[in-house]
């Protein structure tokens, strides 16, 4: 296939037929392969007859492996062949109306390898010690130089050392789940994959899972096929500790999302977002008009709103637990996790990562509402004026009004609470406030002038099968109040 490397293999038949007699027109096959570099590369590495046979036996859903609605692709992560070997739901499972919820594969602890798999020559496994400032800095530098960028290489997530400490050292964290790969000679950290333990509720079933994050590979090693090896190694380490399920997210379509949400963005400093290329100037509008449109009051409006303190942990824990149970897939918090994830404890050498606020009823002193957001900035690549976009991400929230039968009152309360969160974020010098269509967010996104993003976030369960869960969007990919009640977890 040397002459056709990277192109869809030619066929003598009029169409490439998929399984079960489904036909994939050659034009569609070519289009899908053009948007799917992982599968394209796999076909390019085969001889012509092998590639034609594989394509002939694939159905349309299988060809979607590795596609992203936003055009973003992680070639290695999206490997069709790799995901065929993993205990994840197949695309066509979604067509089965009677999906039996539960583990896909029962793991025999006796058969779990106690040693890591082989790595390519010149590289070796390591376990990161994030209590060691030098190793934490190494992970910070790897992520800041080689982690997620947007399509146009204008922005890259910028994880601070404080953020990594917060995200990876939650209650019950395990050092061995902070996995790295080093170059044997230089000792340089060139890849990572990390996990933290948590507990999910999926339609009432409690599952101990590992939350997988920070899969990152040095740009110069992207062709080395390290991603499947990293995933297998973190899986092995979780199995050794008796955890057989995981949750992870991504912008790429893999087999098979349990849910998908859409990103929405609310400008806090519209002019800066325009200058860095994040926000466009709508046709027929002006800069002055857009600044006015996105203006916020200087003071919050909810009586009794104040920063959350340690003394509020029990009340927030009770409120949040009741609120979260309303969703098909949610995080089952412990009191210790509420303390870790939501309470900011000021330290002179660490920047603030999370902002949490409670509403204390002025008369009863009961906590009636709670809202939080966290800081995840993005580096602006090669910009003459701005170095970073300071982004607030909506985190967890809850309100007692959710438990009444008055949906209108709940909607109004949520809009008031979220508008105050925007004001608090603006006061804390954030440039943009991001939120998904998860939780009850469709009740306020459009009303509070959030704009639709071009990114989707797909949620995946590893070694666990569940019927599809609503992500707050309809078939037109717009927020829909009738599609709420599904996703109730926030992944960092």
Locate each region found by the language model.
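A structural/positional concept
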Residues: 217-260, 268-269, 285, 299-311, ...
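Residue-level detector of secondary-structure boundary/capping sites
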Residues: 130, 134, 225, 329, ...
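A conserved beta-strand-loop-helix scaffold within acyl/acetyltransferase catalytic domains
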Residues: 83, 88, 112-114, 119-219, ...
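Conserved ATPase active-site switch/coordination loops adjacent to the nucleotide-binding site
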Residues: 94-97, 191, 242
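Hydrophobic transmembrane signal anchors and adjacent membrane-proximal interface regions, especially
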Residues: 85, 104, 145, 212, ...
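Active-site/acyl-donor-binding loops of N-acyltransferases
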Residues: 2-33, 37-46, 52-58, 65-91, ...
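Conserved acetyl-CoA-binding loop-helix of GNAT-fold acetyltransferases
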Residues: 214-236, 404-423
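A broad, structural surface signal
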Residues: 137, 141-144, 228, 232, ...
